[in-house]
């Protein structure tokens, strides 16, 4: 599959007249809890020729391929990426910390130290809190629930707790988050659920796990109360991001 993904990325570069600066796996495979039939969620950052950024009718700043089978591939222009980094968009931090990398360049190494300086704890907390709340409300209220949905609530909750404790971007791998933030009394329950999730189809239904639901209810309420008290953060300047953009145009 990796060879096919790299072939698709090369086709994108040829067809779109762009250069891919970074291509990674996102989603459950990068989080470390993929099911046997999980999609490959490939995400990439690209740059076009300088002239493309000097047009009155600007080219669209995303490239999206139709989903085919288990392949889901799309990417962002470096221009869009840097603007989102200025807002401390957590997705940017996730892509650049993915443990599964399909393609990279010198831009990635230049980007990472700058990226860390633009991290906002408050923005990260709101992002992961809203993700946890939405998935919990939508998928885990019934008597029977999809096993995989527990991890789409647990991971953002643990990410919030990581940010509250450390003030840094949370790691992609669920195992690293769990080792740091999951309460001891839930370890066996979550380990059993993780084994089930990774060895069952994506649609596997199980009875609701009340001990996990209680933890999620309590955690969501606690995080919301704390993030609402966070002070307004100072807006970062654009200087370093402008320099990165110009450097990307030369690659």
Positions of predicted regions on the chain:
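Catalytic metal-binding acidic patch
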Residues: 27-67
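Acidic, carboxylate-rich catalytic segments that either coordinate divalent cations
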Residues: 231-251
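Helical scaffold of the NTase/Pol beta-like nucleotidyltransferase catalytic core
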Residues: 1-24
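Short loop/turn segments at secondary-structure transitions that flank enzyme active sites
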Residues: 48-51, 88-91, 134, 159-160
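A basic- and aromatic-enriched beta-loop-alpha substructure that forms the phosphate/nucleotide-
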Residues: 55-131
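Conserved nucleotidyltransferase catalytic core and NTase-mimicking acidic/glycine-rich helix/loop elements
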Residues: 112-237
């Amino acid at each position: 599959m990796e060879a096919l993904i790299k072939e698709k990325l090369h086709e994108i570069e040829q067809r779109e007249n762009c250069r891919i600066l970074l291509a990674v796996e996102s989603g459950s495979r990068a989080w470390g809890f993929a099911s046997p039939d999980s999609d490959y969620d490939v995400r990439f950052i690209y740059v076009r020729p300088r002239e493309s950024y000097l047009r009155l009718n600007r080219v669209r700043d995303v490239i999206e391929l139709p989903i085919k089978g288990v392949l889901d591939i799309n990417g962002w222009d470096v221009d869009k990426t840097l603007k989102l980094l200025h807002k401390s968009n957590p997705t940017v931090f996730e892509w650049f910390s993915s443990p599964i990398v399909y393609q990279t360049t010198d831009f990635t190494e230049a980007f990472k130290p700058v990226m860390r300086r633009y991290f906002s704890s408050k923005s990260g907390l709101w992002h992961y809190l809203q993700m946890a709340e939405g998935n919990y409300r939508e998928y885990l209220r019934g008597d029977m629930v999809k096993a995989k949905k527990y991890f789409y609530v647990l991971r953002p909750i643990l990410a919030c707790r990581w940010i509250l404790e450390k003030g840094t971007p949370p790691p992609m791998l669920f195992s690293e988050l769990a080792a740091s933030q999951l309460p001891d009394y839930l370890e066996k329950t979550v380990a059993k659920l993780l084994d089930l999730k990774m060895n069952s189809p994506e649609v596997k239904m199980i009875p609701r796990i009340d001990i996990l639901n209680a933890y999620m209810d309590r955690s969501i309420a606690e995080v919301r109360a704390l993030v609402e008290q966070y002070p307004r953060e100072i807006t970062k300047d654009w200087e370093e991001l402008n320099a990165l953009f110009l450097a990307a145009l030369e690659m």
